[in-house]
C-alpha cells in the first residue's frame, strides 16, 4: 500500500475507532467487522471492490448488502465510504479498524499450535497463564494442529510467542551441541 492509500485508510479508520471506543461498542463492532472480514476472505470480495473494471454503482450495490448489520456505526461507515466513492478502500479500512480496536482494548485472538486438540478445561486453564505472561486479554482462542511440534504447544498473540514444544527444545539442544 502506498503512502496516499495508507493516508486514506487512516483518515477513515482512526476517527471510526475513536467513536467506537467513546460509545463503548468495541465488542459489537469488532464482532460485526470480523464476520464481514470472513466473508471477504471466503469470496475474494476485496479483489472485486478494488478492480478497476467494476463500476462505482456495482461496488456500492455490493457494499450496501453489508448495511444490514446490527451496528449503526458500521452501517454509517459503509454509507460514508459509498458517498465519498471509497468503496475500494473498505477492506483495508476494515483490517486497520480491527487492528486498532485490538491494540486499544488489548484484547487479541490467541492461536494455540499443538499436536492434539485441547479440551475446554485445558483452554480454560491456559487463558489466565496467557493473559499474565503475554500481558493481554484473550478475545478468542484459535487452535491449529501441527504434528511437527512432536509434543507441547506454541502460543502466538500480538506478535508474541510462547513456545514450549519439543521441536523447539530439540532445536535448542542441537544448537548447543554445535
Swiss-Prot record:
Gene3D superfamilies: N-terminal domain of the delta subunit of the F1F0-ATP synthase. InterPro entries: ATP_synth_OSCP/delta_N_sf, ATPase_OSCP/dsu. GO terms for molecular function: proton-transporting ATP synthase activity, rotational mechanism. It is a peripheral membrane protein. It is found in: Cell membrane. Keywords: ATP synthesis, Cell membrane, CF(1), Hydrogen ion transport, Ion transport, Membrane, Transport. GO terms for cellular component: plasma membrane; proton-transporting ATP synthase complex. Belongs to the ATPase delta chain family. F-type ATPases have 2 components, F(1) - the catalytic core - and F(0) - the membrane proton channel. F(1) has five subunits: alpha(3), beta(3), gamma(1), delta(1), epsilon(1). F(0) has three main subunits: a(1), b(2) and c(10-14). The alpha and beta chains form an alternating ring which encloses part of the gamma chain. F(1) is attached to F(0) by a central stalk formed by the gamma and epsilon chains, while a peripheral stalk is formed by the delta and b chains. PANTHER family: ATP SYNTHASE DELTA CHAIN (PTHR11910). F(1)F(0) ATP synthase produces ATP from ADP in the presence of a proton or sodium gradient. F-type ATPases consist of two structural domains, F(1) containing the extramembraneous catalytic core and F(0) containing the membrane proton channel, linked together by a central stalk and a peripheral stalk. During catalysis, ATP synthesis in the catalytic domain of F(1) is coupled via a rotary mechanism of the central stalk subunits to proton translocation. This protein is part of the stalk that links CF(0) to CF(1). It either transmits conformational changes from CF(0) to CF(1) or is implicated in proton conduction. This is ATP synthase subunit delta.
Amino acid at each position: 500500500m502506498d503512502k496516499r492509500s495508507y493516508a486514506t485508510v487512516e483518515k477513515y479508520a482512526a476517527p471510526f475507532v475513536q467513536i467506537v471506543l467513546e460509545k463503548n461498542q468495541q465488542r459489537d463492532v469488532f464482532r460485526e467487522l470480523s464476520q464481514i472480514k470472513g466473508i471477504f476472505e471466503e469470496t475474494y470480495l476485496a479483489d472485486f471492490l478494488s478492480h478497476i473494471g467494476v463500476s462505482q454503482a456495482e461496488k456500492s450495490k455490493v457494499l450496501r448488502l453489508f448495511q444490514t448489520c446490527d451496528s449503526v456505526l458500521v452501517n454509517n461507515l459503509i454509507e460514508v465510504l459509498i458517498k465519498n466513492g471509497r468503496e475500494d478502500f473498505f477492506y483495508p479500512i476494515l483490517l486497520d479498524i480491527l487492528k486498532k480496536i485490538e491494540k486499544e482494548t488489548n484484547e487479541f485472538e490467541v492461536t494455540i499450535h499443538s499436536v492434539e486438540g485441547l479440551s475446554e478445561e485445558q483452554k480454560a486453564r491456559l487463558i489466565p497463564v496467557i493473559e499474565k505472561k503475554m500481558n493481554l486479554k484473550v478475545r478468542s482462542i484459535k487452535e491449529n494442529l501441527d504434528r511437527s511440534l512432536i509434543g507441547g504447544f506454541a502460543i502466538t498473540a500480538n506478535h508474541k510467542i510462547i513456545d514450549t514444544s519439543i521441536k523447539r527444545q530439540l532445536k535448542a539442544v542441537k544448537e548447543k551441541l554445535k
